[in-house]
Regions:
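Active-site bordering "gate/hinge" segments
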Residues: 1-276
Length: 276
């Protein structure tokens, strides 16, 4: 059943239950991943996931919400009925409405459609990559952490007001983490990650080279002289700091009263002058 058919199914079920206002968000995905250990398959995984989150408004305009993975006719009716029952316990202090952007088209960068290569092909590619990485330098003794995966997913939103938005995407990732050992030196490890829309987009040779060079470079270590050093933080480090305190400006946390901020905090400083 595709997303259009699911939307039609939900609409019919809502009419049957006499539910006038509803919306739903859905996520469908197919994931494949492999790991190897010295040429042998260590882990092979394939999964198919589907989850629907449905909201129903009652006559008092209170919202009830439920989730389900059962997209059969009976499963959808049951989920809508549960959301309708839950709406009786909706928060009267928060009146939720459809987003004004619900009917706007989603701007998605066009990309060539990728197809799954399958578990067997993933395993073959990763085995070859492991062998090449081990052969790239005599000091690299193992590749303890590695993985090759591909995911294909679809996101959908639709409501009783006629909105329907969806997009499909794919992604693939290769991860190689090598361990090098030399006499009278501590073992050192490093790795590399490459991403792409599909496995065919990943530069496998570059990933092998990066993992090898980084790992070997770590063997040439020496102690750092105790002294005072000027440290320059990257822009990303400040984003990490802000993310660590994200509850300060998370809307849900503010509404629930578990944030240091409140509804009147807009415009106030978040940091000290030293960080500014």
């Amino acid at each position: 059943m595709n997303s259009k058919e699911i939307t039609t199914q939900i609409s019919k079920a809502a009419d049957f239950l006499n539910l006038k206002k509803w919306d739903y968000g859905a996520s469908f995905s197919n994931d494949y991943s492999v790991q190897v250990d010295k040429g042998e398959a260590k882990q092979l995984k394939a999964s198919q996931k589907q989850i629907l989150t449905l909201r129903v408004w009652n006559e008092s305009n209170l919202v009830g919400i439920t989730t389900t993975s059962d997209i059969s006719e009976s499963g959808i009716k049951k989920a809508l009925n549960q959301a309708n029952i839950a709406s009786d316990f909706g928060n009267k202090n928060e009146r939720t409405e459809f987003s004004p952007l619900a009917k706007d088209p989603i701007e998605v960068k066009d990309a060539k459609k990728r197809n799954p290569v399958g578990i067997k092909k993933l395993l073959t590619i990763l085995r070859e990559a492991e062998v090449k990485l081990l052969e790239s330098h005599e000091s690299i003794k193992s590749v303890p952490y590695n993985g090759l995966s591909e995911s294909f997913y679809e996101r959908v939103y639709a409501n009783s007001d006629g909105a329907f938005r969806s997009y499909t995407k794919s992604q693939a990732a290769l991860y190689l983490y090598a361990r090098a050992e030399e006499k009278n030196k501590k073992p050192r490890s490093s790795g590399s990650v490459k991403l792409g829309y599909g496995v065919e987009d990943i530069d496998i040779e570059s990933c092998i080279k990066d993992a090898s060079n980084k790992t070997i470079s770590h063997l040439n270590y020496s102690s750092i002289k105790t002294d005072k050093y000027l440290i320059c933080f990257s822009p990303e480090s400040f984003l990490t700091i802000i993310n660590a305190f994200s509850s300060m400006f998370n809307a849900r946390s503010i509404l629930d009263g578990v944030s240091l901020s409140n509804k009147n905090s807009i415009g106030e400083k978040l940091s000290t002058e030293a960080l500014n």
